[in-house]
Amino acid sequence: MSETETSHGASIRKRPMQKRAQERVERILAVATQMIAEAGSDQLRMSDVAARAGISIGSLYQYFPDKAAIVRTLAEHYNEAGRDCICQGLDGVSSPSELEQAFTELIDEYYAMFLSEPVMRDIWSGTQADKALCDLDLEDARANAQELAAAMLRAKPARDPDATASTALLIIHLGEATMRLAIQMPEAEGRRLVDDYKRMALRELLD
C-alpha cells in the first residue's frame, strides 16, 4: 500500500493490550503530531514517522495501515477531548442563565483550543475533503448535539424535545463551520466572527 492511499475509514489497525505496545502507539501518535505541527498532514510520510519514532516500517504498519489511519486516530482523540470539555461545561446547567454562561465559556474555550493546536486546525481544515473524516465529524456533531439538547431541556423543560434536538444539532454544526472560517482569518476578525456566532446561537438557545 502506498503512503498516499487511504483506508476508507480505518483508524488504528489493532488496539494494543500490552503496556509496551500501548507505549509504542503513543510514541507513533506523538511523533505524527509533531510532524503535522511542523509541516502539515499533507507532508506526513509513513517512512518518516517510522524513522523518527525509532521503529521499522513493518512495525508501524502493524498498528496503522496508512497515514490516513494516523490522522483519523488523532481526529478521534481531539473529538474525545472536545466532547469531554462539552460534557463538563454543560453538566451543571439547570437554568437559562446557567446555559448562557456555560455555552459562552465553551465557545471561547473551543476557539482558544483551535488557535493553540496547529494539528487540530490542520485536521479540521481537511475534514470536508476526506469522506472518512467527514463521517467522523458528523458522528461527533451528533454526540455533542445530544449533550447540548439535554442541557437545553434542563434549562427549559417545556421545550419540545424533537425541535430542541434539531436546534442543538444546527447550533453545533454552525459552530464548527464558524470555527473553520475563523481560524483562516486574522485573529481579530476571527474573534468577531466567533462573537457574532455566540450572539446568534444564544438567541436560539434561550428562545
Where are these regions (language model features)?
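Hydrophobic alpha-helical bundle segments that form small-molecule/ligand-binding pockets
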Residues: 93-96, 118-122, 131, 141-168
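Helix-turn-helix
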Residues: 27, 35-69
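Hydrophobic alpha-helical connector segments
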Residues: 73, 87-115, 171
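N-terminal intrinsically disordered/low-complexity leader segments
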Residues: 1-23, 184
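Generic hydrophobic, amphipathic alpha-helix propensity
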Residues: 21-32, 49, 74-85
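Hydrophobic/aromatic residues within well-ordered alpha-helical segments
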Residues: 24, 74, 78, 82, ...
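Amphipathic alpha-helical segments used for helix-helix packing
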Residues: 113-132, 149, 177-183
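Hydrophobic/aromatic-rich alpha-helical bundle segments in the mid-to-C-terminal region
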Residues: 134, 154-200
